[in-house]
């Protein structure tokens, strides 16, 4: 008996009672034969106003052409996106994280309402990646991700630069390290065309995680946006989605607990973004896999950092592509027994089978260190707890800035206040900068603190101050930084009670973050604390404040 591949769409296309549905589909140009073909949603996060996304409509057309060669019907649709790089450092960065859940909601909505049989999702920027994955997990229909791809490095006076160079140029100019003319030249040359920010920032981190999970084709995460190989990846979309339909392989068959462990290992080895903690928690929630922040610490305890990527290192993702790409890294890890090779992937094969014929990394490469010569012996993403963060926090400690910091609190109730303090010289060596009321509810939307960390680095204070926040950090942030502090200030967490001059210890060896206050002093301060007014009174941010969970639960909006 022939397998039915259009088991969802036939509800509309073959049911006589759905004549109006069929009339509208005929009106789109479909013919009689099309009515019996499986319908594949091609969900692109295309928009013109961002280098990460500007080319995705073209990729979606390549995917549609490939899908239709396989006697399937490709149905392109779009969803929204937010450019973190553009909104960073402004009040409207509040819209970034909630766009992840809007992307998931909108893809789920279109796919479900139109009864599509499968999904090829094409994200390009930071929140696009987990948003598409959460939709795939919720729907649990055959599907996979084609990453829009990474940008090429910019070049200024013979040296490679990127988006973080542009962010740091302001602080460097303020401190006299570069001229205004050099700053202008930097921002004009940092982004040479289409593709996601080039270092191991959030988009590339999540692309690596998705490939390690088995939810994208091999090499997807490291293939540059404008390369021939990215077009070739799109050309494989049709045969890939048809194979998934024929084998009835669905996201929840692939996104297992072991697959998430593979993802956590790879992003640790790659030196990935702190945002991966939030996003993997949310993606796991979408497929009912039990994952917690403590699982990240378990992986960090036994997994080294090997990749010398920006922001703390030298290289960008396009450099890795040139020496074998992400699969070459995973092959090395598989040989070392660090990955589960038996995990199923969207090729229909296991991870080990996918990697079988992949070439090894060149012996003399300087991008990926050998296991016996790591950049850091344990993971850079450290989960810290203590009286400042009873429910946890996420630190990004590469080791270059040390692993213990003791200093005095310099407290700011917003990102803008802290930026003004740096500009006027009110941030000093030895400070533990505290930026609060920037959490999921308080921000709202848990804005990223890339502007503050870039100012610190640009001003030459990266080795001399620490920064803690209930907000997030961009994948481009580096230094001695601790984010995702829970409970957040808006809900009366300890970070709301900190005062200037408090002695704070951040210990990434013992995984603690404490303020030197007695329980009695903390109780006295707590009794005087009053909740602040919500920053949004209408619209999508108001809804987000009411529904979002804590950072330690992934900031999802659909928990009971």
UniProtKB/Swiss-Prot annotation:
Its cofactor is [2Fe-2S] cluster; Mg(2+). Disulfide bonds: none annotated. The keyword Repeat does not apply. It comes from the Bacteria. Its EC number is 4.2.1.9. Keywords: 2Fe-2S, Amino-acid biosynthesis, Branched-chain amino acid biosynthesis, Iron, Iron-sulfur, Lyase, Magnesium, Metal-binding. The active site is at 474 (proton acceptor). Mg(2+) binds at residues 84, 126-127, 448. [2Fe-2S] cluster binds at residues 52, 125, 197. GO terms for molecular function: 2 iron, 2 sulfur cluster binding; dihydroxy-acid dehydratase activity; magnesium ion binding. It holds the Pfam family ILVD_EDD_N. One of its GO terms (biological process) is L-valine biosynthetic process. It catalyses: (2R)-2,3-dihydroxy-3-methylbutanoate = 3-methyl-2-oxobutanoate + H2O; (2R,3R)-2,3-dihydroxy-3-methylpentanoate = (S)-3-methyl-2-oxopentanoate + H2O. Coiled coil: none annotated. It is an enzyme of class 4 (lyase). The modification N6-carboxylysine is found at residue 127. Binds 1 [2Fe-2S] cluster per subunit. This cluster acts as a Lewis acid cofactor. Homodimer. Belongs to the IlvD/Edd family. This is Dihydroxy-acid dehydratase. The lineage of its organism: Bacteria, Pseudomonadati, Pseudomonadota, Gammaproteobacteria, Thiotrichales.
């Amino acid at each position: 008996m022939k397998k039915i591949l259009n088991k969802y769409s036939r509800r509309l296309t073959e049911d006589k009672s759905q004549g109006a549905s069929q009339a509208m589909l005929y009106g789109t140009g479909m013919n009689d034969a099309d009515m019996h073909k499986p319908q594949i949603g091609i969900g692109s996060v295309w928009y013109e106003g961002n280098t990460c996304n500007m080319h995705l409509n073209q990729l979606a057309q390549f995917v549609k052409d490939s899908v239709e060669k396989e006697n399937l019907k490709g149905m392109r649709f779009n969803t929204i996106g937010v450019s973190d790089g553009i909104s960073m450092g402004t009040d409207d960065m509040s819209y970034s994280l909630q766009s992840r859940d809007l992307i998931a909601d909108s893809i789920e909505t279109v796919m479900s309402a139109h009864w599509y049989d499968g999904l090829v999702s094409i994200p390009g920027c930071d929140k696009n990646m987990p948003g598409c994955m959460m939709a795939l997990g919720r729907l649990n229909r055959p599907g996979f991700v084609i990453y829009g791809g990474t940008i090429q490095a910019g070049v200024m006076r013979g040296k490679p630069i990127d988006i973080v160079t542009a962010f740091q140029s302001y602080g460097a100019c303020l401190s006299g390290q570069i001229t205004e003319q050099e700053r202008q030249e930097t921002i004009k040359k940092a982004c040479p065309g289409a593709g996601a920010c080039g270092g191991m920032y959030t988009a590339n981190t999540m692309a690596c995680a998705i490939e390690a999970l088995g939810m994208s084709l091999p090499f997807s995460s490291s293939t540059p946006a404008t390369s021939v190989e990215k077009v070739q990846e799109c050309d494989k979309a049709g045969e890939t989605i048809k194979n998934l339909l024929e084998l009835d392989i669905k996201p929840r068959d692939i996104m297992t607990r072991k697959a998430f462990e593979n993802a956590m290992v790879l992003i640790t080895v790659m030196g990935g973004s702190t945002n991966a903690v939030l996003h993997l928690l949310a993606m796991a929630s979408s497929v009912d896999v039990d994952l917690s922040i403590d699982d990240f610490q378990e992986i960090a305890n036994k997994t080294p950092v090997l990749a010398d990527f920006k922001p703390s290192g030298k290289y960008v993702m396009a450099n890795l592509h040139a020496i074998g790409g992400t699969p070459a890294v995973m092959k090395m890890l598989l040989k070392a027994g660090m990955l589960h090779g038996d995990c199923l992937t969207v090729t229909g094969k296991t991870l080990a089978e996918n990697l079988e014929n992949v070439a090894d990394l060149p012996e003399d490469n300087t991008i990926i260190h050998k296991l016996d010569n790591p950049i850091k012996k344990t993971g850079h993403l450290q989960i810290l707890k203590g009286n400042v963060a009873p429910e946890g926090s996420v630190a990004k400690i590469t080791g270059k800035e040390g692993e213990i910091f003791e200093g005095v609190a310099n407290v700011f109730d917003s990102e803008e206040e802290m930026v003004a303090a740096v500009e006027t010289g009110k941030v000093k060596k030895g400070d533990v900068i505290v930026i609060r009321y920037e959490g999921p509810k308080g921000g709202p939307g848990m804005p990223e603190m890339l502007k503050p960390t870039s100012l610190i680095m640009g001003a030459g204070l990266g080795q001399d101050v620490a920064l803690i926040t209930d907000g997030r950090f961009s994948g481009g942030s580096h230094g001695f930084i601790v984010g995702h502090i829970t409970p957040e200030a808006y809900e009366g967490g300890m970070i709301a009670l900190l005062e200037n001059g408090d002695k704070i210890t951040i210990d990434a060896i013992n995984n603690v973050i404490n303020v030197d206050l007695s329980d009695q002093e903390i109780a006295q301060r707590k009794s005087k604390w009053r909740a602040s007014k919500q920053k949004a009174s209408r619209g999508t941010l108001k809804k987000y404040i009411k529904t979002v969970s804590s950072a330690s639960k992934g900031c999802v909006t659909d928990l009971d």
